[in-house]
């Protein structure tokens, strides 16, 4: 907390958090400040936070007693989420100014867009729940669930979450992602050069939105764009691949531009194919095993901006949001926990988790010496923060 207050002016940022209550009895800065301690300590629930209510720490940090779990939940349900986004933008700008965020490859930083299902239930629902029907042995059952789309920066050595957008009932993931992308392009216009997405986003409206704002896209190419895929595969068979070695992975890459088979997009497309052979040593048998895979991407970025080798690295970089983003946020930061089953509260707690994640990684990467970072795991460091 002291580091975050010194570098980012955390106390002042917390005082700027707004809410929709008319006559609040407890200040929003007390509610958000308590939630931030819970998130940074990776406690995982408001009830766990309430267990340490009698600690003298709260008087020093909040200047007041800790509110109850129910009060904190109601407070987050009335919180102005745009004010949390403003706080995240301020922290990002400080990191950028301090040259913490460095390009991943070819002098570029990429924005990764992907969707995630945070939780589901067959018993509880709210106004923001999506609905689906499950065919079970006991008949058809209704299941409610929540999904959101997250935007993260892919920089050298770090995947930094920036924002999220809840998917509304009756809305598909790409429409939700486009709404998120419009806001990210407005809030972080110069933060990234390139957008990475999976095969679901290989749609003309998404590509056109990115091109309209001067951003190129790399997305997986699947059977949904069969004409483009067939044209590319036919030409690839007539040419020799470029060979690359990336640690234990051998790659045969084909890279061609000026495809016009995607008529809905209305511009030329670049297609890259990578057939890969990875050398794996089995832990049990100690034998060497080879895993083969094939990847195809469609993109609007020309070769003169991004060569084939770095293109493929960015294409695989999309998985950073799965491995270093959703995986860590869910398993260590309890991002899938329902603190309060209210659409506004779920969004607010999601943004709170993003803010805590950024502050925690800024602290361990910028304030701790390398020998400490290498000696202890992130989980252990988080537990030390909680103990203090």
Predicted regions and their residues:
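Basic, short loop/linker segments at the boundary and entry of helix-turn-helix/winged-helix-like folds
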Residues: 1-33
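Short, positively charged, Gly/Tyr-enriched micro-motifs
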Residues: 23-92, 203, 210
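Active-site-proximal, Lys/Arg-enriched surface segment
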Residues: 73-156
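Electropositive, glycine- and tryptophan-enriched low-complexity nucleic-acid-binding patches
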Residues: 133-191
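An anionic, glycine-rich sequence signature occurring as long contiguous blocks
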Residues: 216-318
């Amino acid at each position: 907390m002291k580091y975050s207050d010194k570098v980012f002016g955390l106390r002042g940022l917390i005082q700027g958090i707004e809410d929709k209550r008319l006559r609040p009895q407890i200040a929003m800065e007390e509610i958000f400040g308590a939630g931030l301690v819970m998130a940074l300590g990776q406690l995982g629930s408001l009830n766990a936070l309430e267990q340490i209510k009698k600690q003298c720490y709260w008087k020093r940090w909040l200047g007041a007693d800790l509110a109850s779990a129910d009060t904190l939940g109601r407070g987050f349900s009335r919180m102005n989420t745009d004010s949390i986004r403003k706080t995240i933008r301020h922290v990002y700008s400080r990191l950028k100014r301090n040259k913490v965020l460095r390009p991943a490859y070819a002098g570029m930083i990429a924005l990764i867009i992907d969707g995630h299902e945070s939780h589901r239930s067959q018993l509880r629902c709210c106004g923001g729940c999506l609905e689906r029907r499950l065919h079970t042995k006991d008949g058809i059952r209704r299941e409610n669930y929540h999904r959101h789309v997250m935007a993260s920066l892919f920089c050298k050595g770090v995947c930094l979450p920036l924002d999220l957008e809840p998917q509304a009932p009756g809305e598909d993931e790409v429409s939700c992602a486009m709404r998120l992308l419009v806001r990210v392009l407005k809030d972080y216009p110069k933060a990234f050069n390139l957008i990475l997405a999976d095969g679901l986003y290989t749609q003309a409206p998404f590509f056109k939105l990115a091109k309209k704002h001067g951003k190129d896209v790399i997305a997986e190419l699947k059977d949904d764009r069969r004409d483009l895929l067939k044209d590319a595969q036919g030409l690839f068979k007539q040419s020799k691949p470029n060979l690359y070695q990336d640690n234990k992975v051998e790659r045969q890459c084909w890279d061609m531009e000026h495809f016009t088979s995607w008529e809905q997009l209305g511009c030329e497309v670049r297609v890259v194919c990578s057939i890969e052979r990875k050398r794996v040593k089995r832990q049990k048998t100690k034998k060497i095993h080879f895993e083969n895979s094939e990847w195809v991407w469609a993109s609007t970025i020309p070769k003169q901006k991004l060569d084939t080798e770095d293109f493929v690295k960015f294409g695989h970089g999309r998985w950073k949001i799965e491995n270093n983003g959703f995986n860590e946020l869910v398993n260590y930061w309890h991002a899938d926990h329902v603190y309060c089953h209210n659409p506004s509260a779920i969004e607010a707690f999601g943004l709170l988790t993003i803010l805590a994640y950024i502050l925690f990684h800024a602290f361990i990467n910028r304030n701790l010496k390398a020998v400490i970072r290498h000696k202890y795991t992130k989980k252990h460091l988080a537990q030390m923060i909680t103990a203090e």
